[in-house]
Curated annotation (Swiss-Prot):
HAMAP family: UPF0161_YidD. InterPro entries: Membr_insert_effic_factor_YidD (IPR002696). It comes from Deinococcus deserti (strain DSM 17065 / CIP 109153 / LMG 22923 / VCD115). It is a peripheral membrane protein. Keywords: Cell membrane, Membrane. Transmembrane segments: none annotated. This is Putative membrane protein insertion efficiency factor. It is found in: Cell membrane. Belongs to the UPF0161 family. Could be involved in insertion of integral membrane proteins into the membrane. SMART domains: Haemolytic. One of its GO terms (cellular component) is plasma membrane.
């Protein structure tokens, strides 16, 4: 894992350890949670591609999207799509 990837994962882990438990109730509508998804995406696809997948996932974590099970893709989506 690159230095950038390790740094991002550390920041996310700090969020999970320090900030997330202080929230009044769980708010992520997906499984795995958005922060865990981000860690998995960065570990699997690197800082840039994994960061993009995590950003897209966080943008979808809102009341207009039903949520549910949404694992990190094994391969980064290819082609002309603007999002995964």
């Amino acid at each position: 894992m690159s230095l950038a990837s390790r740094g991002l994962v550390r920041v996310i882990r700090a969020y999970q350890r320090e900030l997330s438990p202080r929230k009044p109730s769980p708010t992520c509508r997906f499984i795995p949670t958005c922060s865990q998804y981000a860690v998995e995406a960065i570990e699997r696809h690197g800082a840039l591609k994994g960061g993009w997948l995590a950003t897209w996932r966080i943008m979808r974590c809102n009341p207009l999207v039903p949520g549910g099970v949404d694992p990190v893709p094994e391969r980064f989506p290819q082609g002309r799509k603007t999002h995964p």
